[in-house]
Amino acid sequence: VPDYRLDKLNEMYNPKKLVPTTFEFTDIAGLVKGASKGEGLGNKFLSHIREVDAIVEVVRCFEDGEITHVEGKIDPIRDIEIINTELILADLEIVENRISKIEKKAETTKDKAAVLELTALRKSKEALESGKALRSVEYTEDELLCISGFNFITLKKIIYAANVNDEDAIAGSNEFTKLVQEYADKEGSKVIVMCAKLESELSDYEDEERKAFMEDLGLNASGLDQLIKATYDLLGLKTFFTSGEDECRAWTFKDGMKAPECAGIIHTDFQKGFIKAEIMSYEDLATLGSEKAVQEAGKLRLEGKEYIMKDGDICYFRFNVTK
């Protein structure tokens, strides 16, 4: 995950090791009509996609006579709806199968858990049958909890990556991406405009060369960097840092996590034996110039077990594990 703050910490500490935080994009083979019934790589594709945290749908938004579209012409909305329909049908099959198994129990025994699950599933079925993704459904917290184990695909958040030619990537849009944006706006999703061909070329350059090339093109950030940031935000992820002469490292945590949980990301012993966290903000360190200056300014804080971590916190965890 690109982060200018880690670059600044590298300048300040000159550590032996610099470790950015990461997350993984998995390239899953494309979907065809009938995938929900097992056609193409259908069942295999769907089993893979159920395990992910979020979905990035790459949508063709460029004309090129040398690259034939499987459907014959460029129509990004049609392509999106082919994919989304297959995902909806796949979820609907699971919902219907589960309803048939618990319906009788819920209605005869009035078991609270079964009744709650049946209510959530019927709500899901109604949405899916009307062509709506489950992420558009308003569930209660209890309903969401009881259906979380099904890994419904259409419950996952989505980003549309509009794949354009290099000229349109520099311009930021074209007639096709505008259609995708309108579609995404209706469901509250985000669109990233990028050129896969250009991104491939950029990946061949070293950092300084890449930066110079992008400046020549008038690009502030690569499409990949924009996609990474958008995905990070979509999943509610934040970054804290550990820094020193040996290593400066960025760590990913979920928004709302407390200090002991974040300590546990580094090592389970840190969480088990958590005592306190010494914390300074990146902004204070960057402004004041050194840890010593931060401390002298009274900006170095000792936080306890209930402290909710903030993006950009630089941490030293105090812990003690008795064997």
Model-identified regions with their sequence ranges:
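Switch II of P-loop NTPase G domains
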Residues: 4-57, 61-81, 140-150, 173-176
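Residue-level signature of catalytic and energy-coupling elements of molecular machines
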Residues: 9, 27, 45, 56, ...
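Amphipathic, soluble alpha-helical interaction motifs
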Residues: 12, 55-58, 86, 98, ...
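Switch/coupling subdomain of P-loop NTPase systems
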Residues: 54-57, 62-90, 94-97, 155, ...
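C-terminal-of-GTPase-core extension/linker across diverse P-loop GTPases
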Residues: 101-310, 315, 320-321
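Flexible beta-alpha connector loops of hexameric P-loop NTPases
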Residues: 31-37, 72-74, 81-87, 106-113, ...
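Conserved nucleotide-binding/hydrolysis micro-motifs of P-loop NTPases
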Residues: 3-6, 30-32, 60-66, 73-75, ...
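Hydrophobic faces of stable alpha-helices that mediate helix-helix packing
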Residues: 25, 49, 92, 96-99, ...
